[in-house]
Amino acid sequence: MELLKQRILKDGRVIGNDILKVDSFLNHQMDVALFNEMGKEFHKQFAHKNITKILTIEASGIGIACIAAQYFNVPVIFAKKTESRNLDSDAYLSEVFSFTKGKTYTIRVSKNYLNSEDTILIIDDFLANGKAALGLAHIVEQSGAKLGGIGIAVEKGFQDGGKLLREKGFDVKSLAIISSMENGRLSFTE
């Protein structure tokens, strides 16, 4: 998606050779107009899959997922990373390692919100090692729902996550795929 690539080039900051800081428009301060265009693009890519729910993980995927959900006219479910007394104890669980945070979380989704009648679209802001998407896919599998696809805003194509998910047969669509971030310079896969 050219609009997203241009915004990354304009406002993104490379830290080291593997961290891309896009908090000014994607995952801290959110550019809702950009999210609207991303939501339209995800709908264009996955409308034929008859999606019934969108699944993401807290926190950075929620904004994009909610905007995209308007185009599918479906609800959004987000997997929680923390235990809470007000979360139903009857939940699907999965272990997820966060590349950004460098730690493992147990994510959970109440069994009340996913079932075998659903076709799920997973949406997230970043794809690096694929662990978040795999954890969410594991939750979809536990529920008996069908995984319609995985929509990613920014994929780090030089890391193994995208390859891993595609080799498992998942329909992964990334709006921007970064092929390199060496020496502070970004390049994209066309």
Curated annotation (Swiss-Prot):
<feature type="binding site">
    <location>
        <position position="156"/>
    </location>
    <ligand>
        <name>xanthine</name>
    </ligand>
</feature>
<dbReference type="GO" id="GO:0032265">
    <property type="term" value="P:XMP salvage"/>
</dbReference>
<feature type="binding site">
    <location>
        <begin position="128"/>
        <end position="132"/>
    </location>
    <ligand>
        <name>5-phospho-alpha-D-ribose 1-diphosphate</name>
    </ligand>
</feature>
<comment type="pathway">
    <text>Purine metabolism; XMP biosynthesis via salvage pathway; XMP from xanthine: step 1/1.</text>
</comment>
<keyword id="KW-0660">Purine salvage</keyword>
<keyword id="KW-0963">Cytoplasm</keyword>
<feature type="binding site">
    <location>
        <position position="20"/>
    </location>
    <ligand>
        <name>xanthine</name>
    </ligand>
</feature>
<comment type="function">
    <text>Converts the preformed base xanthine, a product of nucleic acid breakdown, to xanthosine 5'-monophosphate (XMP), so it can be reused for RNA or DNA synthesis.</text>
</comment>
<comment type="subunit">
    <text>Homodimer.</text>
</comment>
<dbReference type="InterPro" id="IPR050118">
    <property type="entry name" value="Pur/Pyrimidine_PRTase"/>
</dbReference>
<dbReference type="GO" id="GO:0046110">
    <property type="term" value="P:xanthine metabolic process"/>
</dbReference>
<dbReference type="InterPro" id="IPR029057">
    <property type="entry name" value="PRTase-like"/>
</dbReference>
<keyword id="KW-0328">Glycosyltransferase</keyword>
<comment type="similarity">
    <text>Belongs to the purine/pyrimidine phosphoribosyltransferase family. Xpt subfamily.</text>
</comment>
<dbReference type="InterPro" id="IPR000836">
    <property type="entry name" value="PRibTrfase_dom"/>
</dbReference>
<feature type="binding site">
    <location>
        <position position="27"/>
    </location>
    <ligand>
        <name>xanthine</name>
    </ligand>
</feature>
<dbReference type="GO" id="GO:0005737">
    <property type="term" value="C:cytoplasm"/>
</dbReference>
<dbReference type="InterPro" id="IPR010079">
    <property type="entry name" value="Xanthine_PRibTrfase"/>
</dbReference>
<dbReference type="GO" id="GO:0006166">
    <property type="term" value="P:purine ribonucleoside salvage"/>
</dbReference>
<dbReference type="GO" id="GO:0000310">
    <property type="term" value="F:xanthine phosphoribosyltransferase activity"/>
</dbReference>
<keyword id="KW-0808">Transferase</keyword>
<protein>
    <recommendedName>
        <fullName>Xanthine phosphoribosyltransferase</fullName>
        <ecNumber>2.4.2.22</ecNumber>
    </recommendedName>
</protein>
